[in-house]
Curated annotation (Swiss-Prot):
Record-linked InterPro entries: ARM-like, ARM-type_fold, ELMO_ARM, ELMO_dom, PH_domain
Protein's name in the database: Cell death abnormality protein 12
Cellular component, GO annotation: cytoplasm; guanyl-nucleotide exchange factor complex; plasma membrane
Superkingdom of the source species: Eukaryota
Biological process according to GO: actin cytoskeleton organization; actin filament organization; apoptotic process involved in development; cell migration; cell motility; cytoskeletal rearrangement involved in phagocytosis, engulfment; engulfment of apoptotic cell; establishment of mitotic spindle orientation
Subunit structure of this chain's protein: Interacts with psr-1. Forms a ternary complex with ced-2 and ced-5.
Domain comment, as recorded: The PH domain binds phosphatidylinositol 3,5-biphosphate, phosphatidylinositol 4-phosphate and phosphatidylinositol 3,4,5-trisphosphate in vitro. Required for punctate localization in the cytoplasm and cell corpse engulfment. Required for distal cell tip migration.
Lineage: Eukaryota, Metazoa, Ecdysozoa, Nematoda, Chromadorea
Keyword terms, alphabetized: Apoptosis, Cytoplasm, Lipid-binding, Phagocytosis, SH3-binding
Reported consequences of knocking out the gene: Deformity in the gonadal arm. Defective distal tip cell migration. Defective cell corpse engulfment with an increased number of cell corpses. Absent actin 'halos' around early apoptotic corpses, which is likely indicative of defective actin reorganization around the apoptotic cell. Double knockout in an unc-5 or unc-40 mutant background suppresses the distal tip cell migratory defect in the respective single mutants.
Function: Involved in programmed apoptosis and necrosis. Required for the cell corpse engulfment process. Has roles in the formation of actin halos and distal tip cell migration. Negatively regulates the unc-6/Netrin receptor unc-5 to control distal tip cell migration along the anterior-posterior axis of the body. Plays no role in amphid axon outgrowth.
Alphabetized GO MF terms: enzyme binding; phosphatidylinositol-3,4,5-trisphosphate binding; phosphatidylinositol-3,5-bisphosphate binding; phosphatidylinositol-4-phosphate binding; proline-rich region binding; protein-containing complex binding; SH3 domain binding; small GTPase binding
Every PH domain range: 544-679
Localization of this protein: Cytoplasm
Amino acid sequence: MAFHMPLKELQPVDTSLPEHVVKGAVVIDKEFTIWNHRAVIPSNALHTVFITINLLEQKLTDVVKMAARSMNLSEDDSYGLMADKPKRFITDDNLNSLGSGFILTLCASPDHYVKRITEILTEGNNISQMENAVKTLDEFSLDPALIEAFYRCSSLELLFSLIRDDRVCMSSTLLSTCLRALSSMLELAVGDFTWKSVPNDVVVSMASLVTGKAKREEANTLLAALQMLEQLVIGDDTTRDWILEEVPIETLIRHVEKSDERIALCALSLMNSMIRRCPDDEKRFELIKSLEVVPFRNAVHSSLLRGGGGVRNLNAIEQLVEVQRSLISAYETSPPTDAEVQKILDIESSEDVSEEIREMWKSQIGEHRCGRLAAISMVQFAEKSPQDLRMLISENTMRIEGGKWQLIPMWMRCCDIAAELFRVIPGRDELDRLIVVLFSTETPFPAVFACIVHLFHRTWREMQAKGGEMEKVACVVLEQLRHVLKRREIQDVEELSADLETFSYRAMQEIWREEQLGKENIQLHSEAVIQLKSKLRPKMEELVRINHLNYLKLGAVFRKPQKSKSLAKLAFWHWKLDASEKMLTITGCDGENYVEGVQRDDIRQVWIKDIADVTNNDEIDRKASSSRFTSSPSTQMLRGIRVQLKTTNDMKEGEVLMALTSDETQSVIWLEGLAELIGSKAVKSETDAMVERMLKMELRVRLLNVKLTNPEEKPEIPPIPDDIKSFISKF
């Protein structure tokens, strides 16, 4: 009977755990008894158990007791739970981050870890044990649970005493690990323990590791000390002043030359932080001047700017650019002296310059934004390159009147260009691209200024500029400089000058043309322009259709196809669409030139409605260029138009009219024009191409009047109104 009972549908059962319930494994720490000497693991203890945690109801203490009970361990001892990746102690705060499938380690509590570390470091007998203890502290230095236990059961003074201890300094591993652990703990800023907590004598000990006063110098120790000193400079004004006193910036130069790029970068970063955070302007100026030395430039070149054309470290470039900004800020930009101004005026010996213009130049030089920097660059150019100056002036004098530049205004404008590249004046600087050049030259600003003067002279000549176009030429010169610097990394001033000589005004025009085409293509593919294009397309298609029909109404001469391949006389006929666009008139003619108005007997009129189909039918004419002087005739491709008339009573398949021409454009327009008249849906390549060309022309003309925002230009922020209450009340 049971076999014949009806089937009962089973309902699916959800066996998944609720979201607040997670299940995983717990294993016993192999080093459990090392960190807790009093703990005893019984023989019947289970080393791995599976537990289920209710995250809503259970706290950490409940989970620890449950795990210990499941493992047959004594619940009297204090335990901790540790996650492996990342390695950290589980607390009530991060317990909710556990998911199903977790694997935790039942270990000694954070307090036991700290007490054992403190015992080992306090005894100080076994360097190997001390290294392992500090290594463990370093591993957990970013774990708030263990750091809180460290501050509760021990103190930072323990680590400070290690840094002061000369015996510890002999072990580079112990010292570097201790510095890293201390740095991470202070960076974590648990409680009131921050970088302000470091005492003066510890700062002195760390400074000695950098300045060369320490007995030994090791890469990892040096790296950790440099990083900590920078944090002390940034973190607090008091520790900053201690660093500025204990660490002369000159002692950091030798670290920039290290083969280990990490040390060089940390040394540069510390230099920049010391200069940036220095509260006294006079002291900051002294720090900057200490870097204007040849050993520093050589150190940067040998370590961070080595040749080879490889990809530069972006962090290194950022640090070097900041160094250069500091060096540039120390440039002498105060107003030049009267003697310096007069020296510049004496260089311009042209008799055509009036006294009034000289006074104006004198005033402009004295008020120039670059001050003495501009005056020194001009004088240096005249003194170091007198032959170049004579050549420039002699070429300039040979130009027609009105097409010459004036030396001093040209020099001042070139100084403006160099100042913008160096960020002496507001603008878009190119320090990152000039960085190798800047560190390869003792006086980079005058050297780059000289290159700009030569480029300005060449561009003026190539543009055929006139007297009032100084600003126009200057804008082109600035763009030329930016493009040359963008193309590749330049190693020195000589290479910059050589690259500028090969970069003409015509090359700049080609770049502008390509950029303009690129911008137009981007604009043409924007969503707004695509929508406008779809709206304009019907109008353009109608214009092209009318244009093709008008072309047909003008008429054209075609060759008649020949039935035989003999050298018979070629026959031609003239096809023309009438004004009503309803009839095609075909007239025979004697040659390729049709004469309008001549009476002919062989005239035929074909109604457009009688045309069934229009197709192309090309053929090869092997007699087109044959003559009695050639042994073999050449070939010519003739484009054919095949007009299929509708069937009549006389002809079942309909008559076929053929017209041949060597003009491909004429053939395509007639073919597509007739197809349009009879309503054929054949592919219209010429029509579509012309529609696209006209659409692009129309869109580009319309976009000429659209002002596009430049992403590099910052919008002008209006000033706050004087009476802001009344302004707000209006809205």
